Amino acid sequence: MFRRAFLAFSAPVLLLAVLFCCPAISLAQGSSAAATQAPATQAQIAALERQVQAAQMAGDNAWMLVSAALVLLMTGPGLALFYGGLVRRKNILGTMMQSFAMMGLITLVWAVIGYSLAFGRGNGFIGGFEHIFLRGVSLAPNPAYAATIPEQTFMIYQLMFAIITPALITGALAERVKFGALAVFLALWSLVVYCPMAHMIWGVGGLLNINGGLWPCLDFAGGTVVHVTSGASALVAAIYLGKRDGYPDNAMPPHSMVLSFIGACLLWVGWFGFNAGSALSAGPLATSAFINTQFAAAAAAFSWTLVEWLQNGKPTALGAISGAVAGLATITQASGYVQPMSAVVIGLIAGVVCCLMVLKVKKFFGYDDSLDAFGVHGMGGTMGALLTGLLASGAINAVFGADAAGHPRPVGAVDGNPGQVLNQAIAMGIGWVLAIAGTLLLLLLIDKTIGLRVSPAHENEGLDLSQHGEEGYEFSS
């Protein structure tokens, strides 16, 4: 009896104990499992983050290497063909060699000391010697310039800018300069003019750097660094060297518009690497610069052609391709800062103003800028500097950060920052002064030592034979 009563009483108690204990056991086991799984989950998340970062770096690096190749394409064969077709037949090889020589010579200068002077840590004017012979330039990123690509990729990309900038100057000296003298002049020019300007605007601690400079300058892809300096130097060099024999009394038309046409198309394509590549990553900013590049080139080709058509009664291929290059030069500085329709406006203005510089102003003053390096690049870069300060938008590139409410701070005058136009003008003025002073000093030095200009006999013979001993075209009798 007692046994039955005990079992009747204990059975429900045991059942309740099991019911209450099982969840506790389960929770204890779950807590133990969770404690075991937590580090594993965190490790998986960290591994995924590393994979995402590696994928981003691989994508950015691939885009930047392609962009570097596109910019090199601008010099050779792009600029070489563009300039080569514009000269007389007896000077085509000499002219193309001037561009090609920069691809080799400036590469060596850049590797030895140029990169260090432009992007090494120095003062507000020029970099130091920390990267001489590329010392310390590794496959690891340099966050001061580009956080998702190796510094060697950044270095080689910037090299392509250093190559094409002095090559642009050769257009003002076409058909009358000694090859050796030109090579020495441009190698020194890259150190005296280009590297300081690149450091002031793009280098850490630069006087005009957008991050902490005394006069922050918006120069996305080199409007001032490349086009103002090369254009101003081209004007000084053209005036110093003097006119070609027979200019302007004798007609000196391009010997092959076909070559120039092909060269201009290659320049246009390469410019996507020039501008969109300056985003230094394969992100939305590269897309913005890419679109602005296309829009400005198209608008400038249209407006130059229209002005020429209205004045002369016929549109020319030379006018169309010159307009496109003018638009590309002018949008360079603004490409990563403005809205697409602002790029159209910049292109339309560039085509008209640069056309008038070439057709009217050059004729009025009488200087012999043989291939219009100043009229297209110098004037285009100067306009681009000011128009960038006017039209830059924080909605495209919040380069000055955001306010407390999270809205982009004003960037250009249309954004509510009119002072940026003054900063742009100061930077552009410094570029002009540096280019004029440095170019004149080097020209005087070289002219007094090895001489700059070929003899009248060699000029009449042509640079192909007199400077290189070969001809661009062989015609069988």
Describe each PLM feature range.
Residues M1-G30:
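N-terminal secretory/membrane targeting signals
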